[in-house]
């Protein structure tokens, strides 16, 4: 018995030594990083805003550095060349997502487009999204919806101005922009409006419930959940994050199921052209794949990724224009020349407005809606630059830092739309990601932002509240909104009266 016990002990020791040797070999030549604290690693570096924290760390440790969040290795990439290497040479290896608490509960156990790891299911979701949901033909079919919601925005601003006697009137754009983008997306998805005070909200109680769900989801997605890295904290759940995730997931699921059932029963007055209608038609021929579960995940993804981001970007664009009146003047001149002083701009006109496109590109460079790309996860060992990156490493790309790096941008912190007159400069903007997991909603975002900003410039004269420039500091939130919401003075121009529902 003693012999067998000794043999077993020896085998155990040899196995542990082999595992430690393999692990140490894998962990050799990691990117450099700050010192760690026992157990928590570098969790004390999880300070908001993360993109600024990581930019500061990159100035000490270089364009690629390591952090240990508990027992999980995180590699932060802060240069365009390394980011391109991640999503070209290592694109498939880094095409997975880490498993966080929100993915388990809110994103249907990691099965939605944004949370699923690379594989057949994700490829099918991507195909459905690009071909059936966000194709150019599909987006063109909803042009009337987007035009109507943008016109409503202009009309409400016009009403605000008229009520004050047609002179310069103080307006706050954020609530109006949020209302416009969410209503446009919900009408494309389900044919319903849930925001606004213009008497055209489909169901007041249902609308209130929807707004509460979206608000809570945004709050949870922006939460700093250390339990994702220290399992003990998840068990304790001091912040009640797990309970909140379960609760909002249940509410969201019931809400989305209700929407789908309404369409299935034909209780919603639509022409059958909404995204839900289209997906339900596909489910008739392929019910095993186009399940309610899949449809709910697609709807949720469009709402969370395609609404707040556009509203936030439009607010940043208008703020930069107010801080740079010479740029605003040049944009107005382009609209007058290319579209005409008596003709309202439309989505189809955006290709004629290169300077407006440059303004938007420069805004996305300085104020990307996702300052850190969604986290990637390595499925096997790889190298990035000269460093080893082991399997099961979380990769974070600091787009905000890359976009403001003076090594890669001339006069990097200045707002200069003219820099994008060189066509190759546009390709350096990473606001919508890179590689196979880049955001599929790029075309919709470009249409929404370009059309809305064009109309705001055409229909109103804009000024700051005072001589002092606007505060361009970012606030909290996954989409990096302005810390201080934009308040500006606007005065209606005659062409604003041509806007009709």
Curated annotation (Swiss-Prot):
Its EC number is 1.14.14.88. InterPro entries: Cyt_P450, Cyt_P450_CS, Cyt_P450_E_grp-I, Cyt_P450_sf, Plant_Cytochrome_P450_Monoox. It catalyses: formononetin + reduced [NADPH--hemoprotein reductase] + O2 = calycosin + oxidized [NADPH--hemoprotein reductase] + H2O + H(+). Its main location: endoplasmic reticulum. The chain crosses the membrane at residues 7-24. It is found in: Endoplasmic reticulum membrane. Expressed constitutively in leaves and stems, but not in roots. CDD domains: CYP81. One of its GO terms (cellular component) is endoplasmic reticulum membrane. SUPFAM superfamilies: Cytochrome P450 (SSF48264). It is an enzyme of class 1 (oxidoreductase). Its cofactor is heme. Induction: Up-regulated by methyl jasmonate and herbivory, but only weakly by elicitor. It is a single-pass membrane protein. Optimum pH is 8.0. Keywords: Endoplasmic reticulum, Heme, Iron, Membrane, Metal-binding, Monooxygenase, Oxidoreductase, Transmembrane, Transmembrane helix. It comes from the Eukaryota. Heme binds at residue 439. One of its GO terms (molecular function) is iron ion binding. It holds the Pfam family p450. Involved in the biosynthesis of the pterocarpin phytoalexins. Acts on isoflavones with a 4'-methoxy group on the B-ring, such as biochanin A, formononetin and 2'-hydroxyformononetin. Has a low activity with daidzein and pseudobaptigenin, and no activity with the 7-O-methylated isoflavonoids isoformononetin and prunetin. Belongs to the cytochrome P450 family. This is Isoflavone 3'-hydroxylase.
């Amino acid at each position: 018995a003693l012999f067998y016990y000794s043999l077993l002990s020896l085998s155990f020791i040899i196995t542990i030594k082999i595992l430690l040797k393999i692990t140490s070999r894998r962990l050799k030549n990691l990117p450099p990083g700050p010192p760690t604290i026992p157990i928590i690693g570098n969790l004390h570096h999880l300070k908001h805003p993360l993109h600024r924290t990581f930019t500061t760390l990159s100035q000490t440790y270089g364009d690629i550095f390591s952090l240990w969040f508990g027992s999980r290795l995180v590699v932060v990439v802060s240069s365009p060349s390394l980011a391109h290497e991640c999503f070209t040479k290592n694109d498939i290896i880094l095409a997975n997502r880490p498993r966080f608490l929100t993915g388990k509960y809110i994103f249907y156990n990691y099965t939605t487009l944004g949370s699923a790891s690379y594989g057949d299911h994700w490829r099918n979701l991507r195909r459905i999204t690009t071909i059936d949901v966000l194709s150019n033909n599909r987006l063109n079919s909803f042009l009337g919806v987007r035009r109507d919601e943008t016109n409503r925005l202009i009309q409400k601003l016009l009403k605000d101005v008229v009520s004050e006697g047609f002179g310069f009137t103080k307006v706050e754009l954020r609530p109006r922009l949020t209302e416009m983008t969410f209503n446009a997306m919900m009408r494309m998805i389900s044919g319903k409006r849930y925001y606004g005070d213009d008497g055209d909200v489909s169901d007041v109680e249902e609308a209130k419930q929807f707004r509460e769900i979206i608000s809570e989801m945004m709050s949870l997605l922006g939460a700093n959940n250390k339990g994702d890295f220290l399992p003990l904290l998840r068990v304790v759940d001091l912040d009640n994050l797990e309970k909140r995730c379960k609760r909002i997931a249940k509410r969201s699921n019931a809400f989305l199921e209700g929407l789908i059932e309404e369409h299935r029963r034909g209780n919603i007055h639509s022409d059958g052209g909404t995204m839900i209608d289209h997906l339900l038609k596909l489910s008739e021929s392929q019910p095993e794949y186009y399940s309610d579960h899949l449809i709910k995940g697609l709807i949720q993804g469009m709402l969370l990724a395609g609404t707040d981001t556009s509203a936030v970007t439009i607010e940043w664009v208008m703020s930069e224009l107010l801080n740079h009146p010479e740029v605003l003047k040049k944009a107005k001149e382009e609209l007058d020349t290319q579209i005409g002083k008596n003709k309202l701009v439309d989505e189809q006109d955006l290709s004629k407005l290169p300077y407006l496109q440059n303004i938007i590109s420069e805004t996305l460079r300085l104020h990307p809606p996702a300052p850190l790309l969604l986290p990637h996860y390595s499925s096997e060992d790889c190298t990035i630059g000269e460093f080893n990156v082991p399997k099961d490493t979380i990769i974070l790309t600091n787009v905000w830092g890359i976009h403001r790096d003076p090594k890669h941008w001339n006069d990097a912190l200045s707002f200069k739309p003219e820099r994008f007159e060189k066509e190759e400069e546009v390709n350096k903007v990473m606001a919508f990601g890179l590689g196979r997991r880049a955001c599929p909603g790029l075309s919709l975002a470009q249409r929404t932002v370009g059309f809305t900003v064009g109309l705001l410039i055409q229909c109103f004269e804009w000024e700051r509240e005072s001589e002092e420039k606007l505060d361009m500091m970012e606030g909290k939130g996954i989409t990096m909104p302005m810390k201080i919401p934009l308040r500006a003075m606007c005065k209606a121009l005659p062409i604003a009266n041509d806007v009709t529902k």
